[in-house]
Amino acid sequence: MTLRIFDTGTRTLRDFKPVQPGHASVYLCGATPQSSPHIGHVRSAVAFDILRRWLMAKGLDVAFVRNVTDIDDKILTKASENGRPWWEWVSTYEREFTWTYNTLGVLPPSTEPRATGHVTQMIEYMQRLIDNGFAYAVDGSVYFDVAAWSKAEGSDYGSLSGNRVEDMEQGEPDNFGKRGPQDFALWKAAKPGEPSWPTPWGDGRPGWHLECSAMATYYLGEQFDIHCGGLDLQFPHHENEIAQAHAAGDKFANYWMHNHWVTMAGEKMSKSLGNVLAVPEMLKQVRPVELRYYLGSAHYRSVLEYSESALSEAAVGYRRIESFLERVGDVEVGEWTPGFEAAMDEDIAVPKALAEIHNAVREGNAALDKGDREAAKKLASSVRAMTGVLGFDPVEWGSDAGADGKADKALDVLISSELERRATARAEKNWTVADEVRDRLADAGIEVVDTADGATWKLQ
């Protein structure tokens, strides 16, 4: 069967035809580690981890790039407000994102580039845009000329988001020599006290959109298969990525996939609304594998409305699968059902795929009740194949001293690192930093216990 993907760019289901037969190239907009990850962030990681696993299951060699935006305005602002170096701030939260990905069984990317490590590629990209007449330098900053590009032959600016050029606002100040209000920064001139890198146009730091265009094409080539990300990135970020790439002469991504939001009481989960749920807090209620099951259970293009009852129902659903496999005993991974394959090939329709799994579980339990262990074992093998594709095969999760043990080990590594930073601060009599570490851990439901032998921790 042929995988069909809903391409945001054309708003249609399209047959997936990779640029290079037998291979798939995928770029996912990853974390901006300005603060702790919440389940809104993690839903995107789980959704496209499932996509990646399905591509692999279909026999494709997958190059999966997930970037880290390790420099931007919010990072600098928050680091400054808390009296910490920007790079230390980033490192702290990047570790939290990595722990979260690992705890929920998200496969490590083939490459995880950081923006600050690719300034050379960004300079080359800006030079191409300037040479092509679609970018200009002003007082150390470099801007993309939206008007020039939108009038150029072959321009498709606005097609991804459906916005008209005259209605677009980039959020960039208009008083820094921009030619037009829609123009956006490729490079931001250095400001006192901020990190900067040298370029032919002056010292400064990267613009958000430039980072991804430069890194995606550097690792995956000027034309690659799939670009993924959250729906909120569609404009301006992804729209501007496309503009930069096409204006530079790159074909860029053939397919665009966007996951919808996690909402609570009908509102998008966001830090500004104060309705975010941190992963450690949620792991007090369910195991990591059950949280993964929940986050992946809705279609990636559908809103995932959070409630405690929905989370509990998901955990019960997973335990039903787990219980069946425990009843059967040891079985090898078999083959998925035709219905499962059809569901996954139709734009990664996980709800339909889960229905196939639960049908097999019901039939398997019925077979066991009748004493037909061979039929039950065959169904269990199929269940393992299907749950493996979705990243929650109970046997695999159970093989590492249980999912709880896996989470505890990862959590201990993360918190121990923070306790070491606190111990250093206390030794230097930097009580502000020491208290900040303690308070931030407390906000995540972790109590620091000081003993004669040093600090330890426990869940509140």
From Swiss-Prot:
Where is the motif named 'HIGH' region mapped on this chain? 31-41
Name the positions where Zn(2+) binds. Answer: C29, C212, H237, E241
Annotated ATP binding sites: K271
Q: Which UniProt keywords apply?
A: Aminoacyl-tRNA synthetase, ATP-binding, Cytoplasm, Ligase, Metal-binding, Nucleotide-binding, Protein biosynthesis, Zinc
Query: What is its subcellular localisation?
Result: Cytoplasm
Pfam families in the cross-refs: DALR_2, tRNA-synt_1e
Q: Which domain of life is it from?
A: Bacteria
- One annotated Gene Ontology cellular component of this protein: cytosol
Q: Where is this motif: 'KMSKS' region?
A: 268-272
UniProt keyword Chaperone, yes or no: no
Q: Which named protein is this? A: Cysteine--tRNA ligase
Organism field: Corynebacterium glutamicum (strain R)
